[in-house]
């Protein structure tokens, strides 16, 4: 979303090749009047960022994300990074949303933050007051940097699909105990080949009676946000490896 082009100008001045995705036709005309093609350094793709095909040669993503689509855009960024690794992502989002992304504070784990944790270290940067924008929103924004990491645990690569299913399932009722939450079969478990209600029930019984190494005896009496991301990864891998 290049919009009026302020960020685009700064990126071009850095010597970067810039690709912008802009849905507004008037904004595109404005950008063309101001920049032209910037000596071949600027390409504007017209369309909805949630629907158009992204170029396959991106190295960095720098954007001021609209609040209402921040979550789906982040999901697309993560999908893109999984296919074609990015070097860094710097975005501006709503302050509260940024805290959910980073999980920096005790008890702040969330499905959003845990999903991002699979691929990135999330670093909070400067707050930006609403008055910095026109029209001014009623909330503050926050700069966030996503630094790619190669995430794994002791017993190998993390089962990403199972990890996401389990964390979404448990954090949908985050005030309940983990044992209570895991006793119910996730609605999306059938999306994983070979998984069904009876296999899930047996896997959870095995997990509860034989805790993973390093887990406390009554770990399952905690609420979901009391565990570390690494522990959720261990749980996901332990469940996914269970054979009836």
Model-identified regions with their sequence ranges:
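Catalytic cores of RNA-modifying enzymes
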Residues: 1-169, 231-244
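An accessory alpha-helical subdomain
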Residues: 142, 146-150, 154-211, 219-230
